[in-house]
């Protein structure tokens, strides 16, 4: 992308500016991001209803349970692929909308498709690496497993930003992801850890809000543990479906935004360290200011009205 530096998230960050940029970008474009995420979450939430997990609770034979789980493999794979596709679309929209006024969600859906197959292949490879890293981490006790999980999570933030912003192929994406993630490694690990903790807290609180209208059903179950019918049918309740989709829509854009923040931070630091010299009329060498910092733009003011999506 030639105009990558025009993106409002492109700059060198510290932890304070990174979190402020995350909140400002999210707040400034909340309506568009929420509506897009609501549609995506609604589709994914409805897809989970098609997988009849509650029938597992009526089966006591382990062999039958395994047979049931095998029958769920294809629907679960379709669900995972749909989740990766929605993630690809969201990343493309967040990258291009702030610097291209003609961009909308429908264009994003079409143009993001060219990244989906390479991303799908990368995620299969990445999943194998993640399992290996976490298993190896287990041998270094519980702390090792946590560190490995955080490391894998940190790497995942760079994959789509690198692929989309640099038009990289699979091999280039792997190479650039490793390079940018390990440039400022401890800062990236620290920021990712803070993000994961905040994301977890927000998700738990919002999930509690979703369950408030159904507190009566839980109270009945606590009073009579043998009667779980009200809880079992909860995922099929239209109100629960809508509230769950709305809550997921609130948190869905956070990960892509944060991914672009740490990517652009690494990219800006990388470019500022690669100082280019140009000759003047007297043959002398001078450093250009624009080689050190991204050009300041009015668009970097996050308090402006959100772009229409």
Sequence positions of predicted segments:
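Juxtamembrane transition segments at transmembrane-helix termini in multipass membrane proteins
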Residues: 2-10, 21, 91-103, 152-170, ...
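A short amphipathic helical element positioned immediately N-terminal to and/or at the very start
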Residues: 8-28, 104-113, 170-183
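Membrane-interface helix starts
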Residues: 23-38, 116-121, 182-193
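Hydrophobic alpha-helical transmembrane segments of multi-pass membrane transport/permease proteins
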Residues: 32-52, 81-82, 126-129, 190-207
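Hydrophobic alpha-helical transmembrane segments
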Residues: 33-35, 73-77, 120-124, 189-190, ...
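Membrane-helix interface segments in multi-pass membrane proteins
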Residues: 44-80, 130-150, 203-252
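Hydrophobic transmembrane alpha-helix segments characteristic of membrane transport
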Residues: 57, 88-114
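A conserved helix-loop-strand patch within extracytoplasmic ligand-binding domains
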Residues: 110-130
């Amino acid at each position: 992308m030639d105009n990558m530096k025009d993106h409002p998230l492109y700059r060198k960050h510290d932890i304070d500016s990174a979190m402020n940029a995350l909140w400002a970008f999210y707040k400034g474009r909340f309506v568009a991001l929420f509506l897009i995420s609501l549609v995506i979450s609604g589709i994914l939430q409805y897809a989970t209803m098609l997988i009849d997990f509650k029938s597992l609770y009526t089966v006591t034979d382990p062999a039958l349970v395994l047979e049931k789980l095998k029958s769920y493999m294809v629907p679960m794979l379709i669900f995972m692929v749909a989740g990766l596709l929605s993630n690809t679309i969201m990343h493309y929209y967040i990258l291009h909308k702030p610097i291209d006024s003609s961009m909308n969600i429908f264009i994003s859906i079409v143009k993001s498709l060219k990244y989906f197959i390479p991303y799908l292949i990368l995620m299969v490879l990445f999943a194998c690496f993640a399992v290996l890293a976490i298993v190896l981490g287990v041998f270094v006790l519980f702390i090792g497993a946590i560190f490995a999980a955080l490391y894998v999570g940190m790497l995942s933030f760079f994959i789509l930003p690198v692929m989309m912003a640099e038009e990289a192929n699979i091999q280039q994406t792997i190479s650039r992801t490793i390079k940018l993630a390990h440039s400022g490694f401890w800062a990236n690990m620290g920021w990712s850890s803070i993000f994961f903790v905040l994301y977890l807290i927000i998700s738990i609180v919002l999930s509690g809000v979703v369950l408030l209208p159904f507190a009566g059903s839980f109270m009945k179950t606590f009073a009579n543990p043998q009667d779980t019918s009200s809880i079992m049918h909860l995922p099929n309740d239209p109100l629960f479906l809508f509230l769950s989709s709305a809550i997921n829509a609130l948190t869905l854009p956070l990960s892509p935004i944060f991914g672009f923040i740490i990517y652009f931070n690494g990219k800006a630091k990388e470019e500022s360290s690669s100082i280019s010299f140009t000759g003047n009329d007297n043959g002398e060498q001078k450093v250009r200011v624009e080689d050190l910092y991204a050009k300041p733009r009015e668009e970097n003011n996050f308090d402006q009205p959100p772009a229409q999506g």
